[in-house]
Amino acid sequence: MAAAAGDADDEPRSGHSSSEGECAVAPEPLTDAEGLFSFADFGSALGGGGAGLSGRASGGAQSPLRYLHVLWQQDAEPRDELRCKIPAGRLRRAARPHRRLGPTGKEVHALKRLRDSANANDVETVQQLLEDGADPCAADDKGRTALHFASCNGNDQIVQLLLDHGADPNQRDGLGNTPLHLAACTNHVPVITTLLRGGARVDALDRAGRTPLHLAKSKLNILQEGHAQCLEAVRLEVKQIIHMLREYLERLGQHEQRERLDDLCTRLQMTSTKEQVDEVTDLLASFTSLSLQMQSMEKR
């Protein structure tokens, strides 16, 4: 019998037998030649101090507790064997539904500083926080991101910094406004141009459905009313409007219209008097009105 047990040790067996109340021993085969271990044998072993098992365990080297350990392990599937060795508290923690951890207090403070710095036009702090890994898309309780604040303030440099670090130009705040909407409401033409280049949607500028063409027309009407401004200020504003419209029409695929704007921009650069600038302004206003009419016809 001992020899048979030794043979069983050489070839481990697993699984259940067909005999009632008997099963194969795993993971260490301490069985007879049939590969079976009887619960009756185990009971008699406990009652007789282990004598009933000595002959079936390689000459009595194993104690009844060793067989108890084997019985405890044998019905466990492989994944359960590891579980038996893990403390109960750790198992309970592992069984809890996985919850995504939010930002730490330090990170929350950094994100708030990013928004505050963008709102305060603090370019250096914004750049440092972005380089330190602050998320440019993080919003406050009203859904406003640093890009919303910078766009509303008209700070083109901060807007470009945020876009370069992954800010979403189409992210909406709690009221549904995108950064492009806010830049348009505050008449910040250069910011609109930067946002358009950064991937802002061009299908509608704000909740009222106004486009950069509407904004350009309004701005040009103000310039045509003749408010007292120096020549350079008027030229700069007209140039900004041309750049915005050129980017907008390029996004719409209207390349021929963009070429006309390029011609106007060249003429603007050659102006030296206010009358010449006014002439370019009038041409640009006519171009804008015509483009709006064409858009209205296309929608019909």
From Swiss-Prot:
It comes from the Eukaryota. A motif (Nuclear localization signal (NLS)) lies at residues 99-117. The modification N-acetylalanine is found at residue 2. Residues 1-27 are annotated as: Disordered. GO terms for molecular function: protein kinase regulator activity; protein-containing complex binding. Residues 141-241 are annotated as: LYN-binding. The modification Phosphoserine is found at residues 58, 63. Its main location: nucleus. Keywords: Acetylation, ANK repeat, Cytoplasm, Nucleus, Phosphoprotein, Repeat. A motif (Nuclear export signal (NES)) lies at residues 283-293. It is found in: Nucleus; Cytoplasm; Midbody. ANK repeats lie at residues 109-138, 142-171, 175-204, 208-244. The keyword Cytoplasm applies. Plays an important role in regulating intracellular signaling events associated with erythroid terminal differentiation. Interacts (via ankyrin repeat region) with LYN (via SH3-domain) in an activation-independent status of LYN. Forms a multiprotein complex with LYN and HCLS1. Interacts with TSN2, VAV1, DBNL and LASP1. This is Ankyrin repeat domain-containing protein 54. It comes from Homo sapiens.
